[in-house]
């Protein structure tokens, strides 16, 4: 039985090596049309890692060919679906530089936003419950900037409505993040840092529940620093907003992405 198992393993390994060898040969020698068609087949099958192999071969071997723009769009999609966010952003930036007048610019900006959004979500999941309050979520801020660019320059885009919803969610999430940092500093008696954080929240995220909840922290920080006038001003602000409550902003549902045509 052991011999049979061993022979079976050797046979399967040989098949895998043979298939890999054939695939590599195909990528090295295939025509532009053959490689692109193969990449499309893998995309449709949801085998994004294989799709990337063939599409990258098209891009690298035939950089000025007929499929160049479409290949780059497909790669952005395949990288994103593979959760290779670094390559997604690099590909998106390259596309915007090479095809600034493409009718798919809004799609590429949107994909950059989704990519940064996904990276930022990973950060938040890692952050809350873990003592890492001094870290900044640059990915979520980048996502907000991407979506802002999209709605400013392409207000009628198919992706504008979802971008707006994600901006609202990001704003609320970043405000909660700032509140967590303010609490972190308060526990360490870093009162100047607390006050500065909440002032920043008032400037950047005034219409969020987290900012309202941060006001008492700012008041306490001023009191601890023996700044009664600022503490009194903060109390006035608290009283002016005591009946106000902002509704929770739900995370937008994942969208059904379709590959655009160049």
What are these model-predicted stretches?
Residues 9:
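Conserved glycine-rich beta-strand-loop-beta hairpin in the small C-terminal domain of fold type I
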């Amino acid at each position: 039985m052991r011999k049979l198992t061993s022979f079976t393993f050797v046979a399967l390994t040989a098949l895998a090596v043979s298939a890999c060898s054939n695939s590599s040969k195909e990528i090295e020698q295939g025509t532009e049309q053959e490689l692109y068609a193969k990449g499309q087949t893998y995309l449709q099958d949801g085998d994004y890692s294989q799709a990337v192999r063939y599409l990258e071969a098209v891009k690298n071997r035939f950089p000025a060919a007929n499929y160049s723009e479409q290949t780059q769009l497909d790669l952005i999609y395949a990288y994103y679906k593979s959760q290779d966010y670094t390559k997604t952003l690099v590909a998106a930036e390259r596309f915007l530089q090479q095809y600034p007048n493409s009718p798919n610019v809004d799609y590429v900006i949107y994909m950059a936003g989704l990519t940064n959004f996904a990276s930022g979500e990973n950060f938040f999941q890692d952050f809350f419950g873990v003592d890492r309050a001094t870290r900044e979520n640059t990915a979520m801020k980048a996502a907000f900037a991407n979506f802002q660019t999209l709605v400013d320059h392409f207000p009628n885009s198919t992706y504008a409505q979802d971008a707006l919803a994600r901006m609202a969610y990001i704003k609320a999430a970043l405000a909660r993040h700032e509140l967590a940092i303010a609490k972190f500093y308060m526990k360490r008696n870093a009162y100047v840092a607390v006050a500065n954080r909440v002032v920043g929240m008032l400037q950047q995220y005034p219409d969020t529940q987290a900012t309202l909840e941060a006001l008492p922290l700012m008041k306490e920080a001023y009191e601890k620093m023996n700044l009664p006038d600022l503490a009194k001003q903060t109390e006035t602000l608290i009283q002016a907003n005591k009946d106000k409550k902002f509704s929770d902003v739900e995370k937008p549902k994942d969208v059904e992405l379709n590959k655009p045509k160049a």
